[in-house]
């Protein structure tokens, strides 16, 4: 059975009651974080699900309200040494922005302490388990990313 947890549902800017885009899909032993807007770490802590096994991040598009939370989240993962590797999935334009954020700001040109895999998605299945699969499809959204 799938469980979907909405961490943030606001757009462009947070509101008093809503954080920026972030959801977690939990199925079996897998957890997929979909988008990572600012405030995602706080929302994860408030939800009680914790950070363990949160090593697959799916980015719907590269707008800042969907990726800026990655900086703090990755910084926490690095500080806590709680991750063996991290996979970030997205389209090329989104991953270009994620790369700049991760390598330019978070790591500041240093090598990551754990492998960080930026996976350029093409339409179709990209994650396949015997009981479920995850597919990518193109989205049209205004602006770059």
Which stretches of residues belong to each language-model region?
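Binuclear metal-dependent hydrolase catalytic cores
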Residues: 1-145
């Amino acid at each position: 059975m799938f469980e979907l947890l909405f961490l943030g549902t606001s757009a462009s800017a947070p509101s008093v009651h809503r954080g920026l885009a972030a959801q977690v899909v939990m199925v079996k032993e897998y957890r997929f974080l979909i988008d990572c807007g600012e405030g995602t770490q706080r929302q994860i802590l408030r939800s009680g699900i914790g950070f363990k096994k949160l090593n697959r991040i799916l980015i719907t598009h590269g707008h800042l309200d969907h990726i800026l939370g990655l900086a703090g989240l990755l910084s926490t993962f690095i500080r806590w040494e709680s991750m063996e590797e991290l996979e970030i999935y997205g389209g090329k334009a989104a991953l270009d922005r994620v790369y700049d954020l991760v390598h330019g700001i978070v790591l500041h040109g240093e090598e990551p302490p754990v492998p960080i895999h930026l996976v350029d998605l093409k339409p179709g299945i990209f994650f396949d388990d015997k009981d479920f699969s995850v597919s990518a499809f193109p989205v049209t959204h205004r602006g770059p990313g």
